[in-house]
Design a protein with these regions (language model features):
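Phosphate/NTP-binding elements of NTP-utilizing enzymes
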Residues: 1-364
Length: 364
């Protein structure tokens, strides 16, 4: 499988974040269950960008910059099925709860992040490089995970609970059924917790959260009223200097979903990760590759799954071939990472990009 050049040449908390997750989080399932959770290349690239610090950022312990210390206020990941979005998001939730997510200045010689100074008894120490951004725990975290239903939110919640039980985080994160208690210092029962939000469970909507995680935002639409929930949670985070991350499969451009609105936003403080094969892979005549062509399909799959070492392209392609016998659009959307309309027809080349560009020009 060809791998892209994921080169991190900017100041970021992503290095300490990734190292922290490897030390504290565990692989939740499969044959490696219980092993240290190590990010795939594409995951680290997204983590590094979410943790990208503004070079001019300064640190005042009494008045921290919070989300304004970072280049990106929020992130979006559009990726095909089985890329590892759920377990990775679970690890990022753990990090947001008890890891060094806040910018805490620039390291000098000898500076370290020490778990024993941050409520964790595992003994881990991360030595910073001089000039590297440093991190600290949030003093009173309130985190929400949103999905369309209980079954959908389980894509994150299930690996999250497993990660906690399999490693050192079981002393810091205490699952309590519908929420997870974070062992902290605030003593506030309404803070220091991780909550789940769905279409039918919105009792804590509007809370002053510091981090929000949205699963399958391609399914949040105006008709199911989840765009309203999506924006309400983002407002709650913005008021507290918080941040958010959304993950999804390729969206249906006929639905104007939350994922589509994020992708079409012109805000420069949103990090977007989407390996769109129709923009990157073209024939000599300029037309995108066809999923019906065996050789071109293989190149599409290799491109969109780049950086995911656990993926077996032969297995993915075998499932695609069977799906294509009855519903080619599913194969193209969920595995080919392409925009496919609900009616099953793939968008003509350049149509979505052209409409998007026209809308932006009209709004200017």
């Amino acid at each position: 499988m060809e791998a892209p050049e994921f080169v991190v040449g900017f100041p970021t908390l992503g290095d300490v974040w990734s190292a922290w997750m490897e030390r504290h989080c565990r692989v939740p399932d499969r044959h490696q269950r219980g092993a240290p959770f190590r990010e795939y290349d594409w995951q680290f690239w997204c983590t590094a960008n979410h943790g990208r610090v503004r070079p001019e950022a300064t640190h005042d312990p009494e008045h921290p910059l919070l989300n304004q210390a970072f280049v990106y206020r929020r992130s979006q990941v559009i990726a095909p099925q089985k890329m590892g979005k759920g377990p990775w998001t679970a690890a990022r939730v753990c990090l947001a709860a008890v890891g060094p997510t806040e910018f805490a200045g620039w390291a000098q010689v000898g500076d370290e992040y020490r778990c024993d100074e941050n409520g964790c008894n595992c003994g881990w120490i991360y030595p910073y490089l001089p000039g590297e951004p440093m991190g600290r725990r949030h003093p009173s975290p309130l985190i929400q995970i949103m999905a369309t239903s209980d079954d959908q939110v389980a894509n994150i919640w299930r690996p999250l609970v497993s990660m906690i039980g399999l490693g050192p985080l079981k002393d810091l994160l205490l699952p309590r059924g519908e929420f997870i208690r974070i062992v902290g210092t605030s003593g506030d029962k309404d803070m220091d917790r991780i909550d789940r939000v769905t279409a039918s469970a919105q009792s804590r909507l509007g809370a002053p959260i510091n981090e929000a995680f949205f699963d399958e935002t391609g399914l949040y639409t105006k008709s199911n009223k989840l765009i309203e929930v999506f924006t309400t949670m983002r407002r709650g985070a913005a008021a507290m200097g918080g941040r958010s991350m959304e993950t999804t499969n390729a969206f249906d451009p006929a639905q104007n979903s939350a994922a589509q609105q994020t992708q079409e936003s012109q805000r420069s403080d949103i990090f977007k990760y989407w390996r769109d094969p129709d923009l990157a892979l073209k024939r000599p005549d300029g037309k995108p590759f066809s999923f019906q062509n065996a050789r071109e399909r293989r190149k599409i799959l290799s491109y969109v799954y780049a950086g995911a070492e656990h993926i077996n392209i032969d297995s993915i392609e075998a499932e695609c071939l069977e799906l294509m016998e009855t519903d080619s659009s599913q194969a193209e959307r969920f595995f080919g990472n392409r925009l496919v309309r609900g009616g099953g027809s793939w968008l003509p080349p350049g149509l979505w990009e052209g409409c998007h560009a026209s809308a932006v020009a009209s709004a200017a």
